Regions:
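Active-site substrate-binding loop specific to GH73 endo-beta-N-acetylglucosaminidase modules
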Residues: 1-154
Length: 154
């Protein structure tokens, strides 16, 4: 119970995860998103960080752990097919794409716009929250990207 309160109060505030409630992903771009997925993202982080704190593991595991906590719905969202049922359990990750908190859907969502990912914002988030260094301002002569034409794709 105390570890759960610390995760909810410390980790969610530190990583701005309370902002998840205010994000409404574009359903045309992210059709698989639903409110149940948001709650699964939150629970994954609570269980993951709570495990690290309760086991008195190295704080570095927040960034480097090769496991997470999943139920069937979240596993399918992540492309992992061998998890069955609604209860969350610790799952070893076999890929090189998802490590620690930075690979969780909640952190990826809070560092994205509703209609696209944002590597620059994600990088600034890492600098501010994990390195304690705010990013420098852009040089004054940098122009904005042109508007994307309606219906254009990459």
């Amino acid at each position: 119970p105390r570890a759960e309160a610390m995760v909810e109060n410390f980790v969610f505030q530190w990583l701005r995860l309370r902002e998840l409630e205010n994000i409404d992903p574009d359903q045309e771009i992210y059709p698989a998103y639903n409110p149940g997925l948001l709650e699964a993202f939150r629970k994954e982080i609570r269980l993951f960080a709570g495990n690290i704190f309760s086991e008195n593991a190295s704080i570095l595991n927040l960034l480097t752990a090769d496991y997470t906590y999943l139920n069937e719905d979240l596993a399918l969202h992540y492309g992992i097919s061998d998890i069955k049922g609604g209860h969350f359990r610790k799952v070893q990750l076999d890929d090189d794409e998802r490590f620690g908190l930075l690979g969780t859907g909640g952190v990826l969502m809070v560092t994205s716009y509703a209609n696209r990912t944002t590597p620059v914002i994600r990088g600034a988030y890492i600098m501010e929250n994990f390195q304690g260094v705010p990013p420098a301002s852009p040089p004054p002569n940098v122009e904005d990207f042109p508007e994307t034409p309606e219906g254009a794709t990459v």
